Swiss-Prot record:
Name this polypeptide is given: Mast/stem cell growth factor receptor Kit
Record localization: Cell membrane
Gene name as annotated: KIT
A GO CC annotation given for this chain: plasma membrane
Regulation: Present in an inactive conformation in the absence of bound ligand. KITLG/SCF binding leads to dimerization and activation by autophosphorylation on tyrosine residues. Activity is down-regulated by PRKCA-mediated phosphorylation on serine residues.
Amino acid sequence: MRGARGAWDFLCVLLLLLRVQTGSSQPSASPGEWSLPSIHPATSELIVSAGDEIRLLCTDPGFVKWTFETLGQSSEITHNEWITEKAEATNTGNYTCTNGGGLSSSIYVFVRDPAKLFLVDLPLYGKEDHDTLVRCPLTDPEVTNYSLRGCEGKPLPKDLTFVTDPKAGITIRNVKREYHRLCLHCSADRKGKSVLSKKFTLKVRAAIRAVPVVSVSKASHLLREGEEFSVMCLIKDVSSSVDSMWIKENSPQTNAQPQSNSWHQGDFNFVRQERLTISSARVNDSGVFMCYANNTFGSANVTTTLEVVAKGFINIFPMMNTTIFVNDGENVDLIVEYEAYPKPEHQRWVYMNRTLTDKWEDYPKSDNESNIRYVSELHLTRLKGNEGGTYTFQVSNSDVNSSVTLNVYVNTKPEILTHESLVSGILQCLVAGFPEPTVDWYFCPGAEQRCPVPVGPLDVQMQNSSVSPSGKLVVQSSIDYSAFKHNGTVECRASNNVGKTSAFFNFAFKGNSKEQMHPHTLFTPLLIGFVIAAGMMCIIVMILTYKYLQKPMYEVQWKVVEEINGNNYVYIDPTQLPYDHKWEFPRNRLSFGKTLGAGAFGKVVEATAYGLIKSDAAMTVAVKMLKPSAHLTEREALMSELKVLSYLGNHMNIVNLLGACTVGGPTLVITEYCCYGDLLNFLRRKRDSFICSKQEDHAEVALYKNLLQSKESSCNDSTNEYMDMKPGVSYVVPTKADKRRSARIGSYIERDVTPAIMEDDELALDLEDLLSFSYQVAKGMAFLASKNCIHRDLAARNILLTHGRITKICDFGLARDIKNDSNYVVKGNARLPVKWMAPESIFNCVYTFESDVWSYGIFLWELFSLGSSPYPGMPVDSKFYKMIKEGFRMLSPEHAPAEMYDIMKTCWDADPLKRPTFKQIVQLIEKQISDSTNHIYSNLANCSPNRERPTAVDHCVRINSVGSSTSSTQPLLVHEDA
């Protein structure tokens, strides 16, 4: 058959050649005479089965060609007959016959294949806000329920609409960005069964609705010749189709070499870096460089300025007149600004050829990286007359030195430096002062110490003036007394607009001779000695008083509020709180161990209490006591702390009172013992083993890591702070639930931990733990707030940790050595934890429930940075206070989820009334912790005996409950089976 068809084709070609050469007996159709070619079979659709023949015949007077199209692909032949011997599903498509006049007729052929109901064209792309076609045409048009389905039975988005076409596929209308990565199947029912196509994953190209975002690493550059110029331009857009380039304004020629690097950040964020570099900049490279980017929406640009100088420079700008007048005893600040490039290496202030080592500061005018302007300030306090003169500021860098001199004149009353009688019969006064003093001479009869009624002024014989190094004007004045014939007193009086002073010469005639004159001295040596002694005594008393006031005074940090008037809180005097003697515990039943912490006033000691639970049971406790050197003030403060703890009652997340010894010896306060010490040191120990995940399925990995390491310190490690000592235990792999459940009822009843459960301190730390700590501390603070109690020193160092990783809020108080703790900064006569304090507490000494919320936000930052100090690298100085006033806040710590950082930021709101309450914080964190952690915490809270369940109410409502709740029993002294 194929041979016959080949012969037929050859014959047709031969006839065509003959027709071209000899002409045709039939005239060619003119363009206006063409008609549609006809196709046999004469139908718009044809259905054949797989394996059958497809035979299509096109009839037309002229030549024709067949075109087959399916899934965007096409093929063609120039015969008038299309034959496919064994049809396959892929032969499904549109067959078009076109004649020489461009007219065409079509027939759509379905090749029914039971094994292949859909033709699939992958991948699937769509453009936002446009329709997109899912190319899954049917091979059998007689199926039903042709539609789209989500993969794995997932529903399609509610707003997704589509239309079906068995020949083309399914068109999704108005594609949205949210459909990106949507998994789809085409589906249809055949013979009562649902059939699915291959999986489609829709990739949405975002619609461009804005110009690109363009930024540069540095807005201006100042360089010396030969230095490298490098600037980075960052372009962000939703699509990689964005175009970008560097352009030098007004100069198409440049030596700069551009480099480009790009990547996708997520699904709809495209980032491109355009770096421009000049390896060795020259002066003529100076100019403005523009980073230009455009997309289909529009264009954007940003510029950076390059200035290249031949050599470095320093330009000084005094911020005041170079001549300054100041009154005696006043303060003055000498301020200069200067520009320097390269950076200044040496700065100093010089006075009278002497370098000043203090009283001045030098700092950049802004924190901008390109800043070249600096400020230097010299602070002169309570200037004296002899401290005037020239003050010179000198600055240098690697290229140049520069200086500026300021002349300071101190307005002082005249001072008589010398007054003497010269052998030649001349009286002389040497006077210094500013402005220039006027010297007058007066005579009065009689040998008086002062002239009650002066006569004169006398004629001055000689007077001249000069300038002293300190800026004073020195006047030398003299008169001739040889003409005097009578006893008398001569007064040298110096004055200016600041004041006046005098010196006296008295003399007498004896016979015909004149007695040698002596200058009068105002004070006798005895009077001078008395004044000096009195001054020294005053200085000694002031020093002793200052040292006494600087001594840190101990007070209870926790304050109980009695009344709120606006922002003014009235606190209950803790000494007026009642104390129930049922808390008393026999001293002889306490056995003391090691010291857990010590401060200036007292210490906390580990102890064993016998009979606290039941008569034959021992319990490890912590006992707070005063040192023997404590005064009455400290003893009253410790008693106040005891009363506050007894007033508060019990809660799972505070260090609870167990008992006290107040009679028959020094006061002892017995509280719960927390074996893992403070949370701050616990976090720092766990940094290396931290797992940045809160999923339970990481538990075994974390434990395996810990078992391979050398053992970390735990409750069994005597080297740890605040640690109990127990024998070692054997280990099995526990779960997180075991870890917290092992505490059972927290630390209220001391018991041995089951050896099969690994010690909490040897387990790795993960994100779930940090969320749990956040939640527990918020619960504890909500309890304190419900009792109208303000903590005032909430920080990780004041949170203790016990079995089951239960956190407990405490007040170390007298057991903390704040004098040697860098977290406590001297402010006035107190040492305060400034970095944890709210602005209203720092600047206005206002402590409220809201200021505790601020401190809680700082605590969260400590927690999620695994024990780092807040505001790292920033000393507490005037700049720190200024930044806090201006709204500076810390960035998110490394391990904080976005939701927790949002809580931190709300805690740091400048308006205290906009900060959340602790009750609201608890609700926010509850949404983040896992159900298992929340369930375990609830069980621990429920099984603790006599637990109060306070409801954190509004602050104004809390006040009504003050003083109404004092515990009459010892709620923690219960039997083990309670």
